[in-house]
Amino acid sequence: MAVWIQAQQLQGDALHQMQALYGQHFPIEVRHYLSQWIEGQAWDSIDLDNPQENIKATQLLEGLVQELQKKAEHQVGEDGFLLKIKLGHYATQLQNTYDRCPMELVRCIRHILYNEQRLVREANNGTSPAGSLADAMSQKHLQINQTFEELRLVTQDTENELKKLQQTQEYFIIQYQESLRIQAQFAQLAQLNPQERLSRETALQQKQLSLEAWLQREAQTLQQYRVELAEKHQKTLQLLRKQQTIILDDELIQWKRRQQLAGNGGPPEGSLDVLQSWCEKLAEIIWQNRQQIRRAEHFCQQLPIPGPVEEMLAEVNATITDIISALVTSTFIIEKQPPQVLKTQTKFAATVRLLVGGKLNVHMNPPQVKATIISEQQAKSLLKNENTRNDYSGEILNNCCVMEYHQATGTLSAHFRNMSLKRIKRSDRRGAESVTEEKFTILFESQFSVGGNELVFQVKTLSLPVVVIVHGSQDNNATATVLWDNAFAEPGRVPFAVPDKVLWPQLCEALNMKFKAEVQSNRGLTKENLVFLAQKLFNSSSSHLEDYNGMSVSWSQFNRENLPGRNYTFWQWFDGVMEVLKKHLKPHWNDGAILGFVNKQQAHDLLINKPDGTFLLRFSDSEIGGITIAWKFDSQERMFWNLMPFTTRDFSIRSLADRLGDLSYLIYVFPDRPKDEVYSKYYTPVPCEPATAKAVDGYVKPQIKQVVPEFVSASADSAGGSATYMDQAPSPAVCPQPHYNMYPQNPDPVLDNDGDFDLDDTIDVARRVEELLGRPMDSQWIPHAQS
């Protein structure tokens, strides 16, 4: 729920605290009318201490003013007139207030949002002990920002300590030079007479003794300062490493996991802006500490004092180098993944990004990134640091790209827009593994120079696994491999190991995610749908979903072994359902007009107590991507009727709505919705033409109509009449008397005597029409066929 909606429900002192956040600096009306826009901006991604971020802050200010002006323009009516003036005034006021200091607007809104979230969280503690996911994320982000503040303070502290050390050491060196000068004066005393020499010698000895005692004490102080500074750096690096682990091993890995699930249709992985701001802060603090450590080393070399400091500094220097190396190599990521089902000779794109490119000035010498395709085994060898140089599994065209720095967004990225896989070299397959189960990956590699070539890093990153196909017919099985990998890959795995078996509830989650994404629908798989799928997969009759919760599904069951009595796998059947829904039936699924996941017997059980003419649509058990109509009509012959399945090919000829509209004896959509109420908005209008209209060029226009001759005959016999199948008029359309071309009645039965259709013995009339139109015609019809 939006924070502002919850904030408006605050009461008592919490409400007063919330109201006190607003004033002339930021009116509460602006928060109210632009609540959605305000909460949708990445305020936390801006580093308030970085002057270069002024551009982003200015863009946010301009966006805020524009949104206010748009909101003002849309106000109408008497009340709207006053609001229009008020919002316009606020737009001008905010522009004038923050035009020269846009960072202050960011600081102000961040303060408001943080306190609103805190007040809402405190108010909800009694009703929501666990807290919402958004609250948990907000709390975690708050902790990260607090740690950054702590790191900033300790880094400033060591900077001050370093300056103190420098001043102390410089004064020590001056006094040490004074000691050397005194020693030189002793050598000159020989030239003086004995009395004067004795007097001067005594004074110089006292001065030298005093100075040497001071130098000895000060040397100990210097050594103590150095040790304390090194110890502080050790603590800073511990905190830095902990913070970096949270950001790289938790937050960034979670983003990558979301990116992987997005490949299965999950929600978008989200912006990288916040992550980049954190990584840039890490880079800045790491680099500051590294420079401090190097200066401390320089001081030790300038004035060597025996002790443990040299060893301590060498250790922290090695540690800070490891930390910055991990940061640079881990933040070289793939922002936009290449397609995971990759067809040869087909253009594809990808984008890689370095999250610390701006802060470490990598963009000053723009690096080039190279993309190559490698096998699963080569990826394993790469992660083991084995020599795999020039060991590739194919050839990619346009596989080199220079990284570009975008000043406005502060991003350093390389956009591969026109890559193409020219050829692929496959490895020997294991056992029953097919080519669509073989996984490859795109390797992106580059070389980054940091700190003016002070440090050079070889960086590599691997794409999500890709399956290479050479023909569209392989897409179905390749998608299954990708789905299984994306859903069940474990963090830190060896490329590209996945479990061979998963629990049924895990697969349900993956299927539902994929289904909603493919069909582009919020109507996902219900509990009843999942029971049906479990029955199909496990060949079981149990109707309780709980009975399947402990059952495992193997990869072989999913997409290697055919379903019992069928010539296709579970995934192939499920993918066919998604395909036909996506291409032709999406609005009907969203309307709830397709029951879909029921078998024939379940359909009959659902219809048995319904009035004649009640029908439902279910996915065919016998044909991939098929959908059939089951309806009730109690005749002498039978009570339930099942029409031969329609497929994508059929709906390319005539839509489902029009086919249902043709069959007037289908009256109610299960359970009791009038058919025309559900489907009439999808009927194709029939143009009205007068009966006397002349044919153009001697031709008359044909029209295709869905008919079921066997049912019409049976229903007519049952009614004792003599109606023919053409007496069954379609549902109301635009034209009251549509004209249909007459085709011979199909002599083959569409329905079996027992109510089951047989694909070998039945044929749909629409397909019959298509066959007739494809046969050789008399010479007078040939020109028309070509026109």
Swiss-Prot record:
Protein name per UniProt: Signal transducer and activator of transcription 5B
Subcellular location(s) of the protein: Cytoplasm; Nucleus
Family per record: Belongs to the transcription factor STAT family.
GO molecular function: chromatin binding; DNA binding; DNA-binding transcription activator activity, RNA polymerase II-specific; DNA-binding transcription factor activity, RNA polymerase II-specific; protein dimerization activity; protein homodimerization activity; RNA polymerase II cis-regulatory region sequence-specific DNA binding
An annotated GO BP: regulation of cell adhesion
Organism encoding this protein: Bos taurus (Bovine)
Database matches in InterPro entries: p53-like_TF_DNA-bd_sf, SH2, SH2_dom_sf, STAT, STAT5_CCD, STAT5a/5b_DBD, STAT5b_SH2, STAT_linker
Cited Gene3D superfamilies: EF-hand, SH2 domain, STAT transcription factor, all-alpha domain, STAT transcription factor, DNA-binding domain, STAT transcription factor, N-terminal domain
Protein's job: Carries out a dual function: signal transduction and activation of transcription. Mediates cellular responses to the cytokine KITLG/SCF and other growth factors. Binds to the GAS element and activates PRL-induced transcription. Positively regulates hematopoietic/erythroid differentiation.
Record lineage: Eukaryota, Metazoa, Chordata, Craniata, Vertebrata
Gene: STAT5B
